[in-house]
Amino acid sequence: MSAESERKTETIPEWKQEEVDAIVEMIESYESVGVVNIAGIPSRQLQDMRRDLHGTAELRVSRNTLLERALDDVDDGLEDLNGYITGQVGLIGTDDNPFSLFQELEASKTPAPIGAGEVAPNDIVIPEGDTGVDPGPFVGELQSVGADARIQEGSIQVLSDSTVLDTGEEVSQELSNVLNELGIEPKEVGLDLRAVFADGVLFEPEELELDIDEYRSDIQAAAGRAFNLSVNADYPTATTAPTMLQSARGNAKSLALQAAIEDPEVVPDLVSKADAQVRALASQIDDEEALPEELQGVEADVATEEPTDDQDDDTASEDDADADDAAEEADDDDDDDEDAGDALGAMF
């Protein structure tokens, strides 16, 4: 019998079974369930985090063995989370997707002091400027930890940004004291997501850390390309149909003008074209007595204004030009998120 089977069949105290049942109920009530690291978070701050999460997520802290048993009882692939239950951890459940959960947890982190013996999560820098500390022994403490410090203008000044500890190095008691004196909080305290399970898929933090601006830009560009493909391939969708109808209307109007097809929408333009041609012809006749009264005195330069075929095309295709403008706008990467999402989603 495997260790897992033994763990499932062994008898445990009633209070433990009740705790496991409560954890199982919590797990089954959410779409996404993850494991978070809570090491180093003071209990009061942990309670504040629980309160802040209320309404969007639930944090459950218990013995690791009971968390593992509950995940095994639920099954459905959730037992894969057992590999992340080490040290001080808790389970977090939410109906949000894993990406939203990760972003929420990252945004909720707050700066905190770093103590002696802790490992620097990033380079620790004492910034250039006035420390606000009066001249005294503190200048020597700054210099001893690697800061470029001097006494100037009646106070202790740091003359340039000074990196006093590199990422991954251990913080000394002396450096911890200096940082606390300066009010520098080089670490962030919060719930670190180790893994989250949703819709049968296990996600790790590296897969959830997205550049939102870049992602939005990619979606907008894809939406623009999809819009143009739909228009140019004559493949109508709910989003592109209005533009395609405008283009078709412009083409039909241009054809009607060139072929002199009598249509209620085209007749005014046909009359204008014929009038211009008559006036152009009249301007070439020297004997005004041969002309109707309304055409007498027509200036010769009017002939130069006779519409050409190209000009007819331009006049007839105003709606077509509007359609082209609409298509070009769809290719602009600066389209708002809603238009981009609608265009891409409605493509096929």
Curated annotation (Swiss-Prot):
Keyword check for tRNA processing, yes or no: no
Gene Ontology terms describing biological process? cytoplasmic translation; ribosomal large subunit assembly
Q: Name the keywords, alphabetized.
A: Ribonucleoprotein, Ribosomal protein, RNA-binding, rRNA-binding
- Fetch the Gene3D superfamilies from UniProt: 3.30.70.1730, 3.90.105.20, 6.10.140.760
Where, if anywhere, are coiled coils annotated?
Answer: none
- Looking at the record, which segments are called Disordered? 284-348
What's in the GO CC field?
cytosolic large ribosomal subunit
In which domain of life is the source organism classified?
Answer: Archaea
Q: Does the keyword rRNA-binding apply?
A: yes
Q: Which GO terms describe its molecular function?
A: large ribosomal subunit rRNA binding; structural constituent of ribosome
- Compositional bias ranges of the Acidic residues kind: 302-341
CDD domains in the record? Ribosomal_P0_L10e
One Pfam family name is: Ribosomal_L10
Under the heading SUPFAM superfamilies, the entry gives: Ribosomal protein L10-like
Give the matching PANTHER family. Answer: 60S ACIDIC RIBOSOMAL PROTEIN P0, LARGE RIBOSOMAL SUBUNIT PROTEIN UL10
Q: What else is known?
A: Has been called L10e and L10E in this organism; in this case 'e/E' is for E.coli-like, not eukaryotic-type protein.
Protein family per UniProt: Belongs to the universal ribosomal protein uL10 family.
Q: How does it assemble?
A: Part of the 50S ribosomal subunit. Forms part of the ribosomal stalk which helps the ribosome interact with GTP-bound translation factors. Forms a heptameric L10(L12)2(L12)2(L12)2 complex, where L10 forms an elongated spine to which the L12 dimers bind in a sequential fashion.
> Tell me, what does this protein do in biology?
Forms part of the ribosomal stalk, playing a central role in the interaction of the ribosome with GTP-bound translation factors.
What protein am I looking at? Large ribosomal subunit protein uL10
From which source organism is this entry?
Haloarcula marismortui (strain ATCC 43049 / DSM 3752 / JCM 8966 / VKM B-1809) (Halobacterium marismortui)
> What does the organism's lineage look like at the top?
Archaea, Methanobacteriati, Methanobacteriota, Stenosarchaea group, Halobacteria
Question: Quick one: which gene encodes this?
Answer: rpl10
